[in-house]
Amino acid sequence: MLAGCSSSSLLSPTRRLRSEAVAATSATVSAHFPMNTQRLDLPCSSSFSRKETPSSRPLGRSISLDNSNNNNNKPIERKTKTSGCSLKQNIKLPPLATTRGNGEGFSWNNDNNNRGKSLKRLAEEDESCLSRAKRTKCENEGGFWFEHFTGQDSSSPALPFSLTCSGDDEEKVCFVPSEVISQPLPNWVDSVITELAGIGDKDVESSLPAAVKEASGGSSTSASSESRSLSHRVPEPTNGSRNPYSHRGATEERTTGNINNNNNRNDLQRDFELVNLLTGCLDAIRSRNIAAINHFIARTGDLASPRGRTPMTRLIAYYIEALALRVARMWPHIFHIAPPREFDRTVEDESGNALRFLNQVTPIPKFIHFTANEMLLRAFEGKERVHIIDFDIKQGLQWPSFFQSLASRINPPHHVRITGIGESKLELNETGDRLHGFAEAMNLQFEFHPVVDRLEDVRLWMLHVKEGESVAVNCVMQMHKTLYDGTGAAIRDFLGLIRSTNPIALVLAEQEAEHNSEQLETRVCNSLKYYSAMFDAIHTNLATDSLMRVKVEEMLFGREIRNIVACEGSHRQERHVGFRHWRRMLEQLGFRSLGVSEREVLQSKMLLRMYGSDNEGFFNVERSDEDNGGEGGRGGGVTLRWSEQPLYTISAWTTGGN
């Protein structure tokens, strides 16, 4: 049971779930969705590549559980007409305890040499998808679901799997997924689901009964939603004449509506079952029940997929992958993971492309960059020599618009310098070259200083702070990585480094979430609610069959989920905490808030309107912690939300002496 959760938080915000609706159609779901692109490979502190194969060719490969007995390992292969890959297939048993020493850790399988399309090609292929999403996301009627891609013949039966547990004298058959009926939802799940459902999908309208008896004995309510984000409308005739086959069209429309309603009911059932399986897996890990762990991972691997039709189906795929990684590290003599060789390569370039894709279809990166830039411009008003220290500059997407704003001033600064910090020398050099080109086009005297090092290893002398410069620090989604030290020494050292530069402004952008609990159940509960909103936002803007969507979800958010769930200690870097935590810590260490100006709030709202986000259910902006605001009573930060779920907060700070 997930600690600290109210009983309604675990289903996708895109699906306005009502627990009674599920009871009306509580028959066991027999469809199995293999995890075609699922990954069980990545060490938590690294970034690895994942090449996408062409969509015309099913993804995945046959991987089996090892049935270890008398040192004679015979894998049970799952053969299908096409090569689907599920989580169940990716976990296998090691040799028996007699050969245990050779089997610990991950076994890397180098048999997959296929190279996929580049993300640049994916972007080109998805251009039509992008324009279609922007045209239709604000429509209020009609619905259309893209066909679910499984990469496997749906008629292929799921074969029973058995698990041999090392350490005992007898062989134990732990599960047969095709014959197992999932346990009922825990009592706390009802309120969790209701809370998450309130976040989003005001876009799916179901024909479920208005009042049904809840499976767990709860009260009755109505469930209504209709797909708006992926709506597909047939244009009406433009010559003013009526359709001579209107009676046929009405019949087809009713038939399509019935099919969509059935699909919606099935999706609700599957989402409920996935939540049930995820919580059951957490309980099994806590009780160290190896047989139950294997059952829950295998069953969830059948139903969840990164290419699933609903956001929750895709989201649970990444959570169960992370739990599989976790148990493989906890019990390396029992669980083995054999990922393809291509996962063992870093993919910084593809991560950058995924970030650019996200920038095209959602306002998230633009909100962070533009709001941070406005705070920096306010701090640099009237300054002649400005120096920005960016602790994670990446491709430098934030700075071209900043240069343009500086150059448009009546008295632009005489000299602009950016110190960019990163771990890739090549990427830093390329970023510096691009920024030089932008600055030259704006007639700004510009200097770029790269610092190739890890965040915790940066020292003051590396930053080249000079006299007469007005220094500002830009820290976007980096400070939470210093919270791994339970004593607080790492964050104090980092903030001490920032103070030593004597900045006129520290701009801080962080996830508005609580993902730093010591309890795994609490982290999963809080992060599931948070990333449900993120997946919902992406689902609204990209079609279900979009390869771009797969890459954005996997490379940006899937990695964060793996780190939050699978890692501990210094390897767990995604330790997100909310603005109130940062405010308390910064004030204790001598920083004070610069507040939020009205201009910054108005600009953020204007940006969201470009994405149609002034409508209810989309992105919205609000000031954070207004009661304890900074100068002039202004709020301490500005927060981007998806419906009722906070996502990111940006704030500006300065040292006490300024």
Curated annotation (Swiss-Prot):
- Where are the annotated segments for Disordered? 43-85, 96-115, 209-265
Q: A GO molecular-function term, please?
A: DNA-binding transcription factor activity
Domain of life (superkingdom): Eukaryota
Entry GO CC:
nucleus
Region feature (SAW)? 566-654
Segments for region (Leucine repeat I (LRI)): 272-336
**Subunit-structure text:** Interacts with SNRNP35 and CYP95.
Q: What is its main location?
A: nucleus
Gene Ontology biological process terms, A to Z: positive regulation of brassinosteroid mediated signaling pathway; regulation of DNA-templated transcription; regulation of mitotic cell cycle
Protein name from the UniProt record: Scarecrow-like protein 28
